[in-house]
Design a protein with these regions (language model features):
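Conserved ABC transporter NBD signature motif
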Residues: 60-73
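The feature captures the beta-strand-to-loop junction immediately N-terminal to the Walker
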Residues: 38-40
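Catalytic Walker B motif of ABC-type/P-loop ATPase nucleotide-binding domains
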Residues: 151-155, 160
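ABC transporter nucleotide-binding domain
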Residues: 166-251
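ABC-family P-loop ATPase nucleotide-binding domains
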Residues: 82-138
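A short, flexible loop at the N-terminus of ABC-type nucleotide-binding domains that lies
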Residues: 1-24, 30-31, 36
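Helix-to-loop junction immediately C-terminal to a conserved catalytic motif
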Residues: 53
Length: 295
């Protein structure tokens, strides 16, 4: 029996009397995957990661991390918050020593130093004197140095320039592959993640809209171009629009399509955007029996 890296059942979070940040979210993330958590600003991505990290308690439902309550799994999880909270008065070197002190027995000093060295950071420079991108590098060094089984990253590349983003993403993927680390990282920019991730959680309006391996999700959808007025009633329609005499649509086919329709597989970005533009489109997540079988 394989324990999922991250699983949620009817998970919900509400802050005070405000509207729900997340509601009725259920999914399973198999261990060893690199998962993109994608959605617009305010969709609930940060709330989901904070729940997984044990920084927030659910209002309803459950979340389990590596088969345990998030608090019990904390020593096996690395988390980089969107705000990169570090001690501003410490130097870079002191921050890495703190990481070693807090993670006795499983601190990888070489990896932490390599992440920092890639940014040409002065070890004696204080955190408060670093740029946003440099603080991101230090935060990632702490998270990777911990040698976690599950790495949670909330908008990790937002502060980085394109060269640093490419370099750090390559390092991150290399470390994950070498050690079998499950990586979950959020972004509202699909292009940042589609070349690196093999699993997707699409969050919109506090709900899980898509969940599964990216190849499977893409294979389940078809981009069709057909004459205006073509009958789509037999299929699940995610998005459709008509321009002149032509209809274009992203659908989940329920059977064979007419020979005069042009078909192709949508890109990941096209698929994500089609769901986000149409909140009423039916969600696609594994059925409950499939989730149980995965566990």
């Amino acid at each position: 029996m394989t324990v999922p890296a991250l699983e949620a059942d009817a998970l919900g979070k509400r802050f005070g009397r405000r509207s729900w940040a997340l509601r009725d979210c259920s999914f399973r993330l198999p261990a060893g995957r690199v998962c993109a958590v994608v959605g617009p600003n305010g969709a609930g991505k940060s709330t989901l990661l904070a729940l997984a990290a044990g920084l927030l308690a659910p209002t309803e439902g459950t979340v389990r991390v590596l088969g345990a309550h998030p608090a019990a799994a904390r020593s096996r999880v690395g988390f980089v918050d969107q705000d990169k909270p570090l001690y501003p008065q410490l130097t870079v070197a002191e921050t890495l020593r703190m990481g070693a002190d807090l993670n006795p027995g499983h601190w990888d000093a070489d990896t932490a130093r390599r992440v920092v060295a890639g940014g040409d950071l002065d070890p004696d420079r204080r955190i408060r004197a670093l740029s946003g991108g440099q603080r991101t590098r230090v935060a990632l060094a702490l998270a990777l140095g911990k040698r976690p089984e599950l790495l949670l990253l909330d908008e990790p590349m937002a502060d980085l320039d394109p060269l640093a983003r490419h370099e750090l993403m390559g390092l991150l993927m290399g470390e994950a592959a070498a050690h079998g680390t499950t990586v979950v990282m959020s972004s509202h920019v699909v292009a940042e993640l589609e070349d690196s991730c093999d699993h997707l959680l699409l969050v919109g309006g506090g709900k899980i809209r898509l969940s599964g391996d990216i190849d499977d999700l893409l294979a389940a959808h078809t981009w069709v171009t057909a004459p205006a007025g073509a009958d789509l009633a037999a299929h699940e329609v995610v998005e459709s629009r008509t321009t002149g005499r032509q209809l274009s649509a992203v659908i989940r086919p329920s059977g064979p399509l007419p020979d005069d329709w042009r078909t192709t597989t949508p890109s990941l970005e096209d698929l994500v955007l089609s769901y986000l533009r149409n909140p009423a489109a039916p969600a696609l997540t594994p059925a409950p029996e499939t989730l149980e079988a995965a566990v």
